[in-house]
């Protein structure tokens, strides 16, 4: 298995992802939200890029939808939820469709359409993602959503964790950047270095300490959502 990493949504190129098995990672916080909502009984998740598109999706059947997302890490006016995974409790999301738009994560998902498989990953389901990738028997590209086109330490360390899980079970051929991600994770298995991430500090400034604690937990969820035909299940 060949494994490569793309460091932000801005760096996604057709030739890198075509026919590959892709994992999109945005641990702070879009993919953590998506995984959590589905784990708590959400029927499906529809990722969109623009706020207007999200509003259009729900306008004719509002009661069956949850609107979630953020801009600049803050809740969007008129939406039901922000980008906090802790808001997506079972009593709110069960049986409903979540339409979500975020600054980085949903754009990364929508840019990956030429991939063979598109999985949704985070630290909270990292080992399960690794096991799914092994079962797919295909070359892998891990897409880090990044932060406004820039490299993110948090997504990169999560990539390293998933790579480390795969490498323990099978032979892998890593690109240089994948080797660095695995090395960085192995040097920081307690997740302390994530606290140096710019976006981590931004969320900390907003007082969302419980979000950060939750998103930095490993393997508390066993599902691996997959994006197909515009829907994540």
From Swiss-Prot:
Its EC number is 3.1.3.71. This is Probable 2-phosphosulfolactate phosphatase. SUPFAM superfamilies: ComB-like. Keywords: Hydrolase, Magnesium. Coiled coil: none annotated. Pfam families: 2-ph_phosp. It catalyses: (2R)-O-phospho-3-sulfolactate + H2O = (2R)-3-sulfolactate + phosphate. It is an enzyme of class 3 (hydrolase). Belongs to the ComB family. One of its GO terms (molecular function) is magnesium ion binding. It comes from Clostridium tetani (strain Massachusetts / E88).
């Amino acid at each position: 298995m060949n494994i490569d990493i793309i460091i932000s949504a801005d760096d996604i190129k057709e030739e890198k992802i075509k026919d590959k098995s892709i994992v999109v990672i945005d641990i702070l916080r879009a993919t953590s939200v998506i995984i959590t909502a589905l784990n708590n009984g959400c029927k499906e998740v529809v990722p969109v890029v623009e706020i207007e598109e999200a509003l259009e999706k729900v306008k004719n059947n509002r009661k069956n939808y949850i609107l979630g997302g953020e801009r600049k890490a803050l809740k969007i006016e008129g939406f039901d939820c922000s980008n906090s995974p802790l808001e997506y409790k079972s009593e709110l999301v069960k049986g409903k469709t979540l339409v979500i738009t975020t600054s980085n994560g949903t754009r990364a998902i929508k840019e990956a359409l030429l991939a063979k498989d598109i999985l949704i990953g985070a630290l909270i389901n990292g080992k399960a993602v690794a096991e799914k990738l092994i079962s797919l028997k295909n070359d892998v590209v891990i897409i880090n959503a990044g932060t406004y086109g820039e490299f993110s330490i948090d997504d990169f360390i999560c990539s390293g964790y998933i790579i480390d899980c795969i490498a323990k079970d099978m032979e892998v051929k890593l690109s240089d950047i994948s080797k660095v991600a695995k090395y960085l994770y192995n040097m920081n298995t307690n997740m302390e270095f994530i606290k140096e991430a710019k976006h981590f500090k931004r969320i900390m400034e907003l007082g969302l300490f419980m979000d950060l604690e939750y998103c930095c937990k490993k393997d508390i969820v066993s599902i691996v959502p997959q994006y197909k035909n515009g829907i994540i299940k």
